[in-house]
Amino acid sequence: MGLIDFVKEAGEKLFGRGEAQAKMAEVKSDPDNAAKIAAANGAAGDAILDYVKSQNLSATGLTITFDGAASTVTVYGVAPDQATREKIVLCCGNVTGVAQVKDMMSVDQSEPEAQYYTVVSGDTLSKISKQYYGDPNKYMKIFEANKPMLSNPDRIYPGQKLRIPPA
């Protein structure tokens, strides 16, 4: 899949909690300290990995790294299918502070790739469904394709990137 762009200011706020927050505070106090930068990047990568796992998504050899200077996540591993791969990538990218995800994953079972859509103000899943499928009533297909990251079809936010499965 390569490099996927995300809205850096939108998404889950993972870096403001726990160890990731403490490491980021250390870097801000001494931005020239390479060890502190590496520790902060490691803590951020671990926070994203924990978030992916909290969504009950897994892949063989799943590894997530974060480069704070470039606001880029790199994800490695072998997903069981294309949908899981895409959901893991979305979990990595729909995080405040992440501008890009470098997808280095592969899949056990090859399937057609979904399209991606970035939510803008005023969007609903019905509106997006009408745009992609010509039928606003197919919004549940988009909702199901983005579970477990979406828990309610009415809870999407500007800047969020969604999977749009093939029609």
What is the predicted role of each segment?
Residues 1-107, 155:
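Secretory N-termini
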Residues 38, 119, 132, 149-150:
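A generic helix-loop boundary/linker signal
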Residues 67-74, 79, 108-136, 140:
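Primarily a LysM-type cell-wall glycan-binding module
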Residues 91, 95-112, 140-167:
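Extracellular LysM carbohydrate-binding repeats and other cell-envelope/extracellular binding modules
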